[in-house]
């Protein structure tokens, strides 16, 4: 169970970093 929690936290932090970088730059992919 601990491994599942650690993987969830890792994916969560990576997701937050990805979205912060994505929203910081202009959304060129959407347009």
Swiss-Prot record:
Keywords, in A-Z order: Chloroplast, Membrane, Photosynthesis, Photosystem II, Plastid, Thylakoid, Transmembrane, Transmembrane helix
Membrane topology type: Single-pass membrane protein
Subcellular location: Plastid, Chloroplast thylakoid membrane
Superkingdom of the organism of origin: Eukaryota
InterPro entries reported in the protein's UniProt record: PSII_PsbT, PSII_PsbT_sf
Keyword Thylakoid attached: yes
A Gene Ontology biological process term: photosynthesis
Assigned protein family: Belongs to the PsbT family.
Function according to Swiss-Prot or TrEMBL: Found at the monomer-monomer interface of the photosystem II (PS II) dimer, plays a role in assembly and dimerization of PSII. PSII is a light-driven water plastoquinone oxidoreductase, using light energy to abstract electrons from H(2)O, generating a proton gradient subsequently used for ATP formation.
Protein name: Photosystem II reaction center protein T
